[in-house]
Amino acid sequence: MADSGSDAPISNRPEEEVTVEKTPEMEAAAEEERLRYLEFVQQAAAQVLVLAAAAYAYAKQGAGPLRPGVDHVEGTVKAVVGPVYDRFHGVPLDLLKFLDRKVGESVQELDRRVPPVVKEAPGLARSAAAEVRQAGLVGTATGLAKSAIARAEPRARDLYTRYEPVAERKAAEAWAALNRLPLVPSVTRAVLPAAASLSARYNTAVADGAKRGSAVATYLPLVPTERLSRVFGYPLADAATSPAPEMQPIPSQ
């Protein structure tokens, strides 16, 4: 007679993984820790740390006769910086979280104060795209451009007049700070002449097309070479003997 013991049969199958469902409290905590607007800063900082550590290890390995001096400097830095780092190593993330929340508040405030016509822009763009598909590209695009400029030009001109000098000054300051980094000046000396030449050729082509009556060239903007030369500190003026003329205004119907 078979043994009728209550022992369950032994299975050789591995135990199934137990999936833990996240509770609303856990999801709320994770959302609180996640950076909504500045997460890319956190990721970029982590990537920079990894690359810097790898580069430092490689340089230290190839230091050769300078290795004892490198070790001495490294030990001194660790002795001085270590206690400070242990005390404040959590500050950057907290600071990022604080700034992230401030960005969120600014976005919400901007959304509240932005004119309704700006909020309607995506819908207007979809409507314009549908109209272009139905009625054809050239005539519709011309009409839409004239209508849009007639409505937006006064506001755009006012905003441009107020903010363009500030943006130009900030760009110049950022460019000056960037050029204090190693290798940047040598790279820009190699790149900017080519950019100046291409800008001059582009401006000349657009101006010639506008003189010949090209409808497309009428709507193409010119590269502001004089303004860029002030920002970059490099003569980006057009290579042509005479500067490119200003764009012709769109004729009104």
Swiss-Prot record:
Biased composition (Basic and acidic residues): 13-26
Residues covered by region (Disordered): 1-26
Classification via Pfam families: REF
Coiled-coil spans in chain: none
Signal peptide location: none
Family: Belongs to the REF/SRPP family.
The protein, known as: REF/SRPP-like protein Os05g0151300/LOC_Os05g05940
